[in-house]
Every structure is written in C-alpha cells, then in structure tokens.
Amino acid sequence: MKKIAILLLALVSLAAAPQSASAQFDISKVLGGLFGGSSKSTTTELATASTPYTKLADAAPAITSLYGTWSYSSASFASLGSNPLADVVLAQLDPIVLDVLKNMGVSEGSARLKIESGKGLIWQGSSSQNFKYTYERSKARIVLSTVINSKSVSVSGYIKYASPKVSVMLDVKELIKAIKTIYPEYQNDQNLVLVETLVRDMNDVYAVGVFTKL
C-alpha cells in the first residue's frame, strides 16, 4: 500500500501484499475441511442474553478517555460470534497478518494514533492519514470515515478500553470493501478473494488493533 489507510486497514493488507513464506497456509483447505457447506453465525448483536457485544457496551469508555496519542502495540483477528470454528481459522490467519505487517515495517511502537473530538490522525514515519469518527457509547460502537485516493470509505466497529490500552475492532467485511474501493486493482487478488470467501458466511469477525496510551 502506498500510504496508511484508516486505522486498521493494514490488518487485511495481506490481500494487497506479495505472498510471504508464512503465507503458504492454504485457506481454501480450511474452508473445505472445517466449514463444509455452511458456517453462518447465529449471533444477534446486543441480544437479550449476555453476549460479547453487551459486555463491550457495559464497559464502554467515555470518549474523552480516548483523547490523546496512542502507540501501536499489536494486531490480530477476533470473532465475537457463536461459530466455534471461527477462532480456529482466525488463529491461522493471525501469523500471516503479522508477517505482512512486518514486511510493511509495522511493528510495536512504529505507528501512532491521535484521537481528538470527532477526528483523528494515524501515522507511521512520513506517511499519515486523517479520519473522522462517530462514537455511540451505549453500544461501544464506532464508525470511522476518511478519504483516500479521492475515494470516501467508512468502516464500523467497536471500542474496548482497559487502561492504558485501547482495542479498536473493525468489521473485516467492511475493511475488504474499503480496500476494493480504494485499490480497485486488488479486486481479483487471490489473497483478498480467499479472505473474503472465508468470512462471507461468518458474521461478527473483526480486525483488532491494540494501542497503548503515551
């Protein structure tokens, strides 16, 4: 990628990056072996019973708690749904993502995130990206929007805060859509197609970036 996209867009940049040695994991085999014909999640967001979503909402921080500058710590995938096989597959994807981020020069402490009222900035070295956001504390829900390559994109997700760290959880399907919008040359990229296939019938899958308060 030529510049940093909104927050965690880099988490699924494996779709836009060359295959690395660790990327030899065959996602298609996992799809056939683990999921068979159907793998739809049955999770209902903010359902009556206690769910990961209600727990996030109950612990949602005041937005002012997030103001300031944060340092990138780590990245991973996570599932908040009820599909027991999701974690198995996502655990295999994590090392691939970390390897891609490493090849991009993204490592602990290498990127910064600044959050202000309704807006923010993320940067690494000389590359930076402004974004805007809305935050619904009753659900711990956040929607990020930005303009990259003259194209507007938005991605929704959730915030999890445990001082001094904040986890930004963004919907993987929306991230893939954002990549396709910003970088149409990756529409048919093999890695992107595989990841998209992986999550197509799985709801509640998120790219998680952890940042530490400076």
List the model feature ranges, each with a label:
Residues 2-4, 20-93, 189-214:
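Amphipathic/hydrophobic helical signal segments and adjacent flexible N-terminal regions
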Residues 92-97, 115:
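Short Pro/Gly-enriched beta-strand edge/turn motifs at strand-loop
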Residues 4-5, 116:
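Residue-level detector of intrinsically disordered/flexible regions characterized by low predicted structural confidence
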Residues 7-9, 152-153:
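Short alpha-helical segments and helix-capping/turn motifs at coil-helix boundaries
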Residues 8-16:
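Bacterial N-terminal signal peptides
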Residues 52-57, 97-108:
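N-terminal post-signal-peptidase region of extra-cytosolic proteins
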Residues 12, 59, 102, 122-124, ...:
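Residues embedded in well-ordered secondary-structure elements
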Residues 75-80, 101-184, 212-213:
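Contiguous, well-ordered beta-strand patches that form the walls/edges
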